Amino acid sequence: MRRRDFLIGAARGIGSGVVLGSLGQVAWADTGQDQCFVPWNSKTPMASWHKKKPPYRIALSNSYIGNEWRTEMVQIAKMYSEHKAVKPFIKDLKISSAGNDVNSQIAQVNQMILSGVDAIVMDAASPTGLNSTIDKAARAGVLVTSFDNVVTTKKAITINEDQYEMGKRWAEFVVKHTGGKGHVLMVRGVAGTFVDNKRYKGGKDIFDKHSGIKTTEVYGKWDNGTAQKVTADALASGGGFDAVWCEGGDSGVVRAFQQAGAKVPPIGGEAENGFRKLAAKEDFPILSIGQSPALSALSIKVAIQMLQGHKVPRSISVPLHPVTNKTLKEGKNYFPGVPDSFYAAINIPECGLNFDAQAVVNQKV
C-alpha cells in the first residue's frame, strides 16, 4: 500500500444512519460530513489514502495515561471499536501508552509499523519529536491520524479542537468577571505539550492586554489531585485570587478553595463532571469548555474513512461546546451518577458520536 498525494476535493461519508446500543446513541457513519469533517481553515487541503478492503488493523499510540482524561479517551476508543456497527471494519485495535516519554513513544510506533498495522491513531508526547517516525510510517504505507496533542508533520491527519481559542475564551471570561483587574491563578496542563502551549498562549494573549491583571502559574497536569495540591500551595503561600484560568483538574481547584475556607472565584476551565456538578450546586461563575475524549473515536472514524478511499481535510477542526451556569443541564452535560473526575464532554454530536456516561465509566481499559 502506498501513500497518495494530498488532493483538493470534497469529503464524503462512509455510510449513513444512527446505531442504537449499549453505548447510548453512536452514529458510525454519515451525520452530515460537512458538519463533522470541517477544514481547519480555508487553506486546508483535502487528503486521500490508498483504498484497502476492510477489516483493518489499527493501533492507538497514547503518550500518557496519568490522568482521568487519558483513561477515558482509551475507554471511548475501545467502546467505539467494539460497537456492532464499527466492528466489521476493525480486525484488531492495539492500545499502548508511553509514559509521556518521546523516545518510548517512538519505539512504540516503530513496533506498530513493524507489526503491519494499517493505521495508527496518536496522542503525541511532542508536537515535533515524532515527526520523523510518522514520516517513516507513511513511507511504509501506514496511515497516521493525530489528535489532542497533535504533531506538525504534514504526513499525518490532525484532528483537534482549537486549543488557542479555548484558552482565549477562558481568559475573556475571566476578564469579564474581574473587570480586567486582579490576581488570576493559571493552572496549566502538562509542560511542553501542544495543548498546553496553545491554550496558554490563547490565555496570555488576552491577559497581556490588561495591565491590571497579575497572573500566577502552576502546573496541574490536567489531573484533579495534582491541580488541588498546586492550588492549595498557591493559596497557602499568600495568594488571594480573584479568578482562575484552568486547563484541567478544575474539581481539584474548587476543592482547594473550599478546604482553605476561601470563596470560590469565577473559573474558566475544562469539563470535569465534578466541576460542573459543584457549579450547578453552589452557583459560582464558570465557563466550562471541554476537550472531548471522544476525539479518539473520531480519529478511528477518520482512519477508516480514509482507508475506504474517501477524502478528508488534512487538518480537521472539531467544534467547541461551551457550557455556562445558564446552560448546565443534569444528564446532558453533567452526570450525578458518575465520578467527579469524569470528563463530561463525551459527545461530538456533529459527527454522530454520542456516548452514555455510565457505559464509559464501566468500560475496562
For every predicted segment, state its role.
Residues 6-8, 15-19, 28-365:
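A residue-level marker of the well-folded mature domains of exported/periplasmic proteins
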